[in-house]
Amino acid sequence: MTSPSTIKQRFLSKPNQLGVVAVGFNGGQCKLGVEAAPMALVEAGLLDQLRDDLDYEIHYDNTVHYYEKEIPAEDPDHRGMKKPRAVSAVTETLSSQVYEHSKEGKFTLTLGGDHSIAIGSISGIAKATRERLGREIGVIWVDAHADINIPEMSPSGNIHGMPMAFLTRLATEEKKDIFGWLQEEHKVNLRKLVYIGLRDVDRGEKKLLREHGIKAFSMHDVDRHGIGRVVEMALAHIGNDTPIHLSFDVDALDPQWAPSTGTPVRGGLTLREGDFICECVHETGNLISMDLVEVNPSLEAVGASDTIRTGCSLVRSALGDTLL
């Protein structure tokens, strides 16, 4: 039996209230199944655990959003991007949904879906935080991949490898129906972005990370310094006066712990290292929102329940669950 967090939340006016958006969207990549993750997480008892064990008042519309009405019949490639209009329309709608929760000072949890949905969740959080607090957000992106491909650089054309490029405005697009809706108010400052867990980074992304001085901790850094020191350095980079959004892709974890994901990469974080990152970010009192993405229950029949359990554990840890 756990109990509610005693950490004072610095940037949430309603810290015991949790706004949840369930996003059943797979259009940022090519594998079916990731759209089933929000329902699987809810059915595994995630929201019940947050309510019963951690005492959150949950604001959830009991709906997994598949956004069928937003998805156009015709969606030809643009600048090499696959399904650009679908991803743009879905993330624009999601941005508004997340904004509505966040502007009230609630913690906002977005359950994906593939990682392209972060274009929606993070833009909504950034806008709400600028309006509510007059501050920029910091983003901690825990992932095997940097997801900062500019469309023309992307080897695959899958938009789940591009969200950070659009959110930081390294990639821009004039067309209203292809991310032209993203404005300055939605932007993430490159100096307030930190990566943890990287180990499969495209050549063009490495160049961008270096050129822009983006703070990134690869698995090499985790091996060298230990996860404790890495998290300490990541948080120091963002600073203690910044509201934090945590975007957690389960493929940051080694496939041993999260096998059911679309792009697994060996040599990743352990389950405890993943939970530890979430625990430490919670302990700052600065965490205002989180995404959990890329759980794909249709891959690896045996591994699906393990991966769902892992996802639940990460979210609980970020929301104040402790071992003792």
Curated annotation (Swiss-Prot):
Pathway: Nitrogen metabolism; urea cycle; L-ornithine and urea from L-arginine: step 1/1
GO molecular function, one term: manganese ion binding
One cellular component (GO) term of this entry: cytoplasm
EC number of this enzyme: 3.5.3.1
Reaction(s) this enzyme catalyzes, per UniProt: L-arginine + H2O = urea + L-ornithine
BP GO terms, sorted: arginine catabolic process to ornithine; urea cycle
Keywords: Arginine metabolism, Hydrolase, Manganese, Metal-binding
Chain residues that bind Mn(2+) 2: 143, 145, 249, 251
Cofactor note: Binds 2 manganese ions per subunit.
SUPFAM superfamilies: Arginase/deacetylase (SSF52768)
Cofactor: Mn(2+)
Protein family according to the UniProt entry: Belongs to the arginase family.
Assembly description: Homotrimer.
Record-given protein name: Arginase
Organism: Emericella nidulans (strain FGSC A4 / ATCC 38163 / CBS 112.46 / NRRL 194 / M139) (Aspergillus nidulans)
Lineage: Eukaryota, Fungi, Dikarya, Ascomycota, Pezizomycotina
Gene this protein is translated from: agaA
